[in-house]
Amino acid sequence: MYLVVGLGNPGKQYEATRHNMGFDTVDRLVEDYNVPQGGVKFNAMYGKTMIGGEKVILMKPLSFMNLSGGPVREMANYFKIDPESELIVIYDDIDLEPGQLRIRKQGSAGGHNGIKDIIRQLGTEKFLRIKVCLLYTSDAADEL
């Protein structure tokens, strides 16, 4: 089983902003795979599905991005997710050019406070991160 977390900030003022690319990516997966809403647990929205024959939990923390670690840790513990092999975190990276994607298996937070909080809460830097940067236009969702 995998836990796929999209980072972002709750609230209308943050919708369709580069900072919410993690949320938008999870929303697109929910749409593409017709994932039923699982509800709210541990201050996060989540849903379960199968992707490529694997059980996947798609999650969006309802806390502000800088406090994402608590909901991620609690959800991982509840579903017995091993962060080092079953956690994927998707978020924006301001250092990437529009249209770029970077995947890392481990490492420091690189100045990203949401990742910093997840590392602090999990006690490890060893989890998969997908960093994205898309140009925001009215057609941005089609780029995901």
Give the label of every model feature segment.
Residues 2-105, 116, 120, 124-131:
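Nucleotide and nucleotide-moiety/phosphate-recognizing core
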Residues 136-144:
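Single conserved hydrophobic/aromatic residue that forms the stacking wall/gate
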Residues 109:
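Phosphate- and other anionic-substrate recognition elements at nucleic-acid/protein interfaces
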